[in-house]
Design a protein with these regions (language model features):
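A short hydrophobic beta-strand element within the catalytic core of glycosyltransferases
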Residues: 256-257
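Conserved catalytic-core segment of nucleotide-activated headgroup transferases in glycan assembly
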Residues: 67, 167-170, 182-240
Length: 364
């Protein structure tokens, strides 16, 4: 029997049987054939430039990432920028032209992306594409009772730590997963020849207690510390060090100090551990599952004990190097860039396939 669109259900079954999924969510002029959820082709991901470091590591995967750019370079519309050495798979799209482009899925990275940006620049048919939302942060309003702004169970929620997933109220959705950080192995290794600690936090004073400004301000009275990051010059810091130069810069310091009370596990911490640097941190959020006290760093909620430990690291470079070697082993195992991009590509593909299988079910 010859199948044609006029055969209705039989024609649809024939398409499914042959592994072809037809995207009905788009108007005829924008329709695209997907073979098994496009499992065989190179994916086209649309997202915004929100966190440069995260986007850089995400771009190490085997897919293409499209990001919008506008004339004012407003939040999320910076394009590639000049800070990170993005490869050719990070592609700028004029914000006004986004609605005319073909993508396999949409990745939200902030409340603004989800509540405002998508409605400003995406066509209606694009807003029905497979969608994911990566939540980079811990809950802000309340540590346990904050309902996430993204409440659509059809959108895949991705948390960057298990602590974040535990604390956010995701509305009971089962469409939630965790993809832990991944960073590249740096070309430099830990030296530790500067007998001081290094702190890497943007706008630490302006962000207050969350980023531990008061903790840092107290500790630096007792321990030699340097501070770098955007907006730190007025807080006694050295200013910003661009990400490509960061591993070389921090590798000379004896240890990395993270005074942050309540945020996600920092990429700067992952990068420091990957160089073989010991990390000193508060025993909060995801840090307690990664840093083992006096094995690969120092971790505690007692600031006096941390001060004592940091001064011991200053006095004993051999001990600092031993802790740093263990930190590198942990980082290599836990924060592999290969595992990270594989997790993301699998999540993209599974989300796309699930979307089209559901949308093209012969039983609907």
């Amino acid at each position: 029997m010859r199948f044609s669109p006029s055969n209705g259900l039989m024609y649809k079954r024939a398409l499914v049987a042959n592994g072809i999924v037809f995207d009905k969510a788009r108007p005829v002029s924008h329709q695209r054939l997907h073979m098994n959820g496009n499992n065989s082709g190179r994916l086209r991901i649309f997202t915004w430039h929100i966190h440069g470091s995260y986007l850089y590591y995400l771009s190490k995967g085997n897919y293409d990432i499209f990001i919008p750019v506008n004339g004012t370079r407003s939040e999320g519309y910076y394009g590639r920028g000049e800070t990170f050495p993005f490869g050719p798979n990070v592609i700028e799209v004029d914000a006004a032209d986004v609605r005319n482009k073909e993508f396999d899925c949409i990745l939200f990275q902030s409340e603004r992306n989800y509540l405002i940006d998508q409605h400003d620049i995406l066509a209606d048919w694009q807003k029905r594409l497979p969608r994911l939302y990566v939540e980079h942060n811990t809950p802000v309003q309340h540590p346990t009772n904050s309902r996430h702004v993204m409440t659509d169970p059809a959108v895949k929620m991705v948390h960057v730590t298990h602590f974040n997933k535990l604390m956010w109220d995701n509305g009971g959705s089962r469409n939630v997963c965790v993809i832990e950080h991944g960073v590249c192995i740096p070309e430099v290794s830990y030296r530790g020849d500067i007998p001081r600690g290094i702190v890497v936090i943007n706008h630490i004073e302006q962000r207050g207690r969350i980023t531990g400004w008061d903790v840092f301000d107290e500790v630096r009275k007792h321990v030699p510390l340097d501070l770098i990051g955007m907006g730190t010059s007025g807080s006694g810091g050295l200013g910003e060090v661009l990400n490509p130069q960061l591993p070389e810069f921090i590798s000379h310091y004896r240890f990395f100090f993270n005074p942050i009370r309540y945020t996600s596990f920092g990429l700067a911490v992952c990068e420091a551990m990957m160089t073989g640097m010991p990390v000193v941190a508060l025993a909060t959020t995801e840090y307690v599952t990664v840093i083992k006290d006096r094995e690969c760093g120092l971790i505690d909620t007692n600031i006096d004990r941390l001060i004592e430990g940091m001064n011991n690291l200053i006095a004993d470079p051999v001990w600092a190097r031993q802790l740093g070697e263990q930190a590198r082993e942990v980082a290599t195992s836990k924060f592999s860039i290969t595992r990270f991009v594989t997790d993301w590509e699998n999540t993209f593909r599974q989300t796309i396939q699930h979307n089209y299988e559901k949308g093209n079910s012969i039983y609907q």
